[in-house]
């Protein structure tokens, strides 16, 4: 296992059938983006031959790679920054910047949860999340699998521009 496991096309097909509940067509929109979110908020990334139509990805065929990204939360990771995000009882406009893989999404998720739930001395507020790639709430069948707070509304797999107008 240290070197990996060589998979056959049958292994990949069987795995895709299983994670798609034997109805992959129902996940066409997600698969077009190169991944599928499963129960627990885990993401299954795929690679293969992209099918292009009008300069847009219509789908992915001949899937040759499956990458499982296990979702995890780190509640409390935003504790140290929360005092800097409030001024005069109001939440400040905030931009989170860092290199890839340093925890921006994890911190954002915890900030959302704390704002939504209300963490002393801050009041709970209504939060709207446009989760374009199911990375923040990790929705499965429309239900957030990650704790994003009790006052948070999530638009899952929604383009940001459209979602901002909907909220």
Kindly label every feature range from the protein language model.
Residues 24-91:
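P-loop NTP-binding catalytic core
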Residues 116-161, 165:
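P-loop NTPase switch/communication element
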Residues 77-130:
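P-loop NTPase nucleotide-binding module
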Residues 1-40:
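N-terminal accessory targeting/assembly segments
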Residues 60, 110, 142-145:
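Short, glycine/charged-enriched secondary-structure capping and boundary segments
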Residues 52, 75, 101-102, 133-137, ...:
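Short, catalytically relevant binding-site loops at active-site mouths
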Residues 17-20, 24, 51, 86, ...:
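Signal for well-folded cores of large energy- and translation-related assemblies
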Residues 8-15, 42, 92, 107, ...:
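Helical mechanochemical/support elements of P-loop NTPase systems and associated helical scaffolds
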């Amino acid at each position: 296992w240290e070197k990996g496991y060589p998979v056959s096309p049958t292994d990949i097909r069987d795995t895709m059938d299983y994670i798609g509940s034997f109805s992959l067509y129902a996940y066409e929109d997600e698969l077009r983006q190169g991944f599928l979110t499963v129960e627990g908020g885990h993401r299954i990334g795929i690679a293969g031959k992209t099918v292009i139509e009008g300069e847009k990805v219509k789908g992915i065929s001949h899937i040759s790679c499956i990458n499982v990204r296990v979702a995890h939360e780190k509640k409390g990771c935003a504790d140290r920054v929360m005092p800097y995000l409030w001024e005069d009882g109001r939440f400040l406009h905030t931009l989170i910047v860092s290199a890839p893989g340093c925890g921006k999404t994890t911190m954002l998720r915890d900030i959302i949860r704390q704002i939504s739930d209300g963490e002393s001395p801050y009041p709970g507020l209504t939060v709207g999340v446009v989760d374009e790639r199911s990375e923040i709430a990790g929705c499965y069948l429309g239900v957030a699998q990650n704790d994003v707070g009790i006052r948070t509304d999530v638009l899952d797999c929604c383009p940001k521009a459209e979602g901002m107008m909907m909220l």
